[in-house]
A protein has these predicted regions:
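Gram-negative outer-membrane beta-barrel transporters
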Residues: 528, 580-587, 594-596, 718, ...
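Short acidic/polar hinge/loop motifs at secondary-structure boundaries
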Residues: 202-231
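Face-selective signature of the C-terminal outer-membrane beta-barrel domain
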Residues: 419-433, 459-630, 658, 662, ...
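Transmembrane beta-barrel wall of Gram-negative outer-membrane proteins
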Residues: 291-436, 532, 592
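C-terminal beta-signal and adjacent terminal beta-strands/loops
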Residues: 205, 676, 734-737, 741, ...
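Short, acidic, small-residue-rich periplasmic hinge/interaction motif at the N-terminus
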Residues: 49-55, 109-152, 190
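Membrane-embedded beta-barrel scaffold of Gram-negative outer-membrane proteins
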Residues: 469-470, 479-495, 660-662, 667-673, ...
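Extracytoplasmic beta-strand/coil segments of soluble accessory domains associated
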Residues: 104-107, 160, 164-201, 231-232
């Protein structure tokens, strides 16, 4: 068995030279002779090789048949890599030798009788980036990684379910549209948490009625090869504007499909089917609890109880309760991916199709329930009155079909990578995603008499990237990466305009909201490595992004004033310096400069107020209407009308220090990170939901994140070759000048219902921890987050207190506040030589901070916070690896069929009930 992995550099770093800095040698042997300090303790050979690789700049991979059960004496002192490796393998029965390609190989040492080495195949030892799952516990920051196996293990019903169980990470409005709106430690939307696909940003903003907006990014999990999650501001090319963190997704490549190193092609076929769903009903189908109100009863004469006063016979639509059996499937997902490669070229092509029907809510919990209360005393001697109210958590009943939870998508992926030389390669990728889905408007859930199935909304998202990488083997100062990317998103959201039109189910009964969002980005960065008083890695570069939004008012019934038009451009310069003065210490310092401009494509008009403030109307006639919009050309030389613009810039640092006192995997760190988020294109243009106001300039958000944590990664704790990983952090996040929607203040004399502005601050503090233990036969993962302080501050009219922990009137932040705590417990076991993997996960979710019974500031506007309840959900899974080519997966999500509402839901939408899923993967 052979393991071959790519390398940022297959050479070992250049040696320290007293007279200055030396470049990496073109001859690996010369670099290998350079001396460096090693301090690797005795213990498991696997662990010792891993630590040796991290110190020497290589990753040692070996067949477990060679290393299993062997221990290393370790190595301490200053040695060349060759000598250190010999000492590390002393007494293990293994030896290393250099191959012609400059790499290392391990083999069994010759026996004392000279009979030669074992017939086991030699194993290549090449440099490589460390395993992402292990790097989580070596990084002086809060990070997480999702592998393909993690994504497949808990696929869930909605795309956002793959993030369940990650501490500090939630998904807003997870049951709507198939899009992703990631929340990291309370930061969400408008670029606070960029979701990147192969480095490209795709986020769009979607109107959610009185409840505000949602930010959405679209991708099919079958086409994702891995996900890296960074929490807090990030230094580097990907971190521009990321006040909450970054979610970086990598699409599948040839190595994900071609499983054997000596093969040059491969095909992966994957399919799954799931139950607890049915076909979407016809547009206009009613659901949920309806007919709440006050009616007459016990009438004398009986005619007084007729017509509109008659008590309804039903409060639900019985058609929505024909729930299929647990093992009766309707929804499905399928994908085919193929790859081909040779020494110069890699090609990947994949297609994916997914159909999610309207799912059914769980049966156990507090669903909708009509509560009838008689008026006491009776209002009349001729009749009594009875008031019907909903006594449940949401307007959907337990076990009911959740209207508009349907989603169908098609995706295509094309990738090619060309190796121009040993030092250069170029890669091109194209991803297309198209979806049609039901749109559940929060206003229907809160205020309409009935909830209706809408006509499907649509979105098409296209992403293209072109990247070039140049890294000469003999130039340690040159590791140049260039990328150009583009995203183009067309969306058409259909929402009912009225109940009468909804019942008709006709095209005239919807108000389409078409939007086109384009982004173009450029990245240029270089990494230099050198040794002066320790090892240094310096990354630096620039990024640029241009955005444009436009709307087509000719489609449907959309009012031209509601759509948005505008453009935005932003560039940043960054530097990230890593210094390791000694094996125990690592110091990082980063700096980012940003510059941003936006321009509203629509003409804003100054509104003149009431009589006494005469103004000219569009025809130039003086008028005393209450509100008079005055175009510039009709204002007698006074600029009463304009295109709203913003221009902002600033510089922020990121720095950290880590200490590994015993070089045994236990690391302590402290980190201070800042980020600026410039006003987004949505925030600085006028249209639905909110618009900027004259005299209220928009400033950048400024986030400061302080974090203190520890990492532990070790082996042989409770038994030989087990693995223990632990990560814990205390964080203090403060965002000054937080941008959000608010109500206008009395002293501002603004004639708008809502105003986009900077409020004073948002603060979140808390603890986060993850424990990961794997003993082979059994494994477990425990993780959780607890917030001990949440505060939002704003000085405004009618506010009793400037600061509270539950929200601000009209603010989008109200539905971004995370629960005070959430946790996850995973237990698993492997059988049949690891072919059978069984496990269960318990998810525990706390409540949202409650709003006060009196003086609730959020009640002054429409978007009252969604107050979900705490819940516990159990998911189980099984995977059987029949052969290298065939694997079968079986899952049951929400095993106990709980009725619950996900956190950060803009409307009270219940999650899916018990759902069984069966999947099959074939590799050729």
């Amino acid at each position: 068995m052979r393991f071959r992995v790519s390398l940022v550099s297959l050479l070992i770093l250049a040696a320290y030279a007293p007279e200055g800095v030396k470049a990496q040698s073109a001859m690996p042997a010369a670099a290998a002779n350079a001396e460096r300090d090693f301090d690797i303790q005795a213990g498991s050979l696997d662990d010792a090789l891993s630590r040796f690789g991290a110190r020497a700049g290589i990753m040692v991979l070996a067949d477990t048949r060679l290393t299993a059960g062997r221990n290393s004496p370790g190595v301490r002192g200053r040695y060349s890599v060759d000598v250190a490796l010999v000492r590390l393998l002393s007494g293990t029965g293994l030896q290393a030798y250099r191959a012609a390609d400059g790499g290392y190989r391990l083999r069994l040492a010759p026996s004392p009788d000279g009979s030669g080495v074992s017939e086991l195949e030699a194993v290549e030892v090449l440099g490589n980036d460390p395993k992402p799952a292990d790097e989580v516990y070596r990084t002086a920051a809060s990070v997480n990684y999702l592998s393909q196996d993690d994504i497949e293990r808990f696929r869930g019903t909605s795309v956002g379910d793959i993030f369940q169980g990650i501490p500090g990470v939630l998904v807003g409005e997870n049951r709507n549209s198939g899009g992703l709106d990631i929340n990291i430690r309370g930061m969400q939307g408008q670029g606070r948490v960029p979701v990147l696909v192969d480095g490209a940003r795709q986020e769009t903003t979607v109107y959610r009625g009185y409840s505000g907006v949602a930010s959405r990014s679209y991708v099919d999990p079958d086409l994702i090869g891995g996900i890296e999650i960074s929490k807090g501001p990030v230094a580097g090319a990907l971190g521009t504007g990321a006040t909450g963190g970054v979610v970086a997704m990598r699409t599948i490549n040839a190595k994900d499909i071609i499983k054997k190193e000596d093969e040059n092609w491969g095909i992966r076929v994957r399919g799954s089917t799931s139950g607890n769903s049915s076909a979407a009903p016809a547009a206009g189908t009613a659901g949920g609890m309806f007919n709440a109100g006050t009616y007459r009863v016990n009438c004398d004469p009986a005619a007084l109880c007729g017509g509109q006063y008659s008590m309804p016979d039903t409060y639900r639509n019985d058609e929505n309760f024909d729930r299929p059996g647990t093992l009766d499937p309707y929804s499905y997902a399928s994908s085919v991916a193929g790859a081909w490669r040779n020494e110069k070229l890699e090609l990947v092509a994949a297609v994916s199709k997914r159909r999610q029907g309207t799912y059914f809510a769980g049966k156990h919990g507090k669903g909708a329930e009509p509560v009838i209360t008689l008026t006491d005393p009776p209002p009349s001697i001729y009749y009594d009155t009875a008031t019907v109210t909903n006594g449940g958590t949401t307007r959907f009943y337990t076990g009911e079909r959740v209207l508009n939870s349907n989603n169908e998508s098609n995706s295509q992926l094309l990738k090619g990578k060309l190796k121009l030389s040993d030092a250069q390669d170029i890669e091109l990728s194209y991803l297309r995603y198209h979806s049609e889905y039901g749109e559940l408007m929060p206003s229907q859930l809160m205020w309409f008499n009935k909830i209706y199935q809408t006509q499907n909304s649509e979105v098409t998202a296209q992403t293209a990237t072109l990247s070039h990488h140049w890294q000469p083997a003999d130039q340690s100062w040159l590791d140049l990466r260039t990328k150009v990317w583009m995203t183009h998103t067309d969306s058409l959201n259909r929402n009912y305009a009225s109940e009468d039109q909804a019942e008709a189910g006709a095209e005239s009964g919807v108000a389409p909201e078409p939007e086109t969002y384009r982004r173009i980005g450029v990245e240029l960065g270089n990494t230099s490595q050198f040794e002066v008083w320790g090892e240094h890695t310096l990354s630096y570069g620039a990024t640029f992004q241009h955005e444009k939004i436009s709307t087509d008012p000719s489609i449907g019934a959309l009012d031209d004033a509601a759509g948005r038009e505008g453009n935005r451009r932003e560039y940043s310069l960054y530097m990230d310096w890593h210094w390791q003065p000694a094996p125990e210490w690592q110091i990082n310092y980063g700096l980012r400069y940003q510059n941003s401009r936006t321009r509203d494509g629509k003409l804003s008009t100054d509104m003149r107020y009431e009589c006494g403030k005469w103004a000219m109307d569009a025809q130039g006639v003086e008028s005393c209407q209450q509100y008079v919009a005055v175009p510039t050309e009709m204002c007698d030389g006074v600029a009463c009308s304009y295109h709203y613009k913003t221009r902002n810039s600033g510089t922020v640092p990121v720095y950290s220090i880590s200490w590994e006192p015993w070089l045994n995997g236990l690391q302590f760190y402290a980190r201070h990170a800042e980020a600026l988020r410039m006003p987004s294109l949505f925030e600085s243009t006028q249209g639905w939901s909110v618009q900027p106001a004259p005299g209220v300039p928009l400033r950048p958000e400024h986030t400061r994140n302080r974090e203190f944590g520890l990492n532990l990664l070790t082996n042989d704790v409770l038994r030989s070759n087990d693995r223990l990983a632990f990560k814990a952090a205390y964080f203090r996040n403060k965002t000054n000048d937080y941008l959000t929607r608010t109500s206008p203040n009395e002293w501002e004399n603004l004639q708008q219902d809502f105003v986009m502005r900077n409020i004073r601050s948002v603060k979140l503090r808390g603890f986060e921890a993850t424990l990961d233990y794997d003993a082979g036969r059994v494994y477990t993962r425990l993780s959780g987050t607890r917030y001990n302080f949440i505060e939002v501050c704003h000085e405004g009219s009618y506010r009793r207190d400037d600061c509270n922990n539950y929200g601000v009137a009209a603010s989008y932040f109200n539905d971004m506040i995370p629960p005070k705590w959430h946790a996850s417990v995973l237990l698993g076991t492997r059988w049949l030589d690891g072919k059978l993997d069984l496990g269960a996960r318990l998810t525990l979710m706390g409540k949202r901070n409650p709003t006060p019974a009196f003086n609730d500031d959020t009640k002054r506007a429409f978007n009252w916070p969604t107050l979900w309840q705490d819940y516990k959900v159990v998911d189980i899974y099984a995977r059987y690896q029949y052969s290298e080519a065939v694997s079968v997966d079986f899952n049951i999500d929400n095993l106990t069929d709980r009725y619950y509402v996900d956190p950060l839901s803009l409307g009270m939408v219940p999650a899916p009930g018990r759902t069984a899923r069966l999947g099959l993967t074939l590799n050729f």
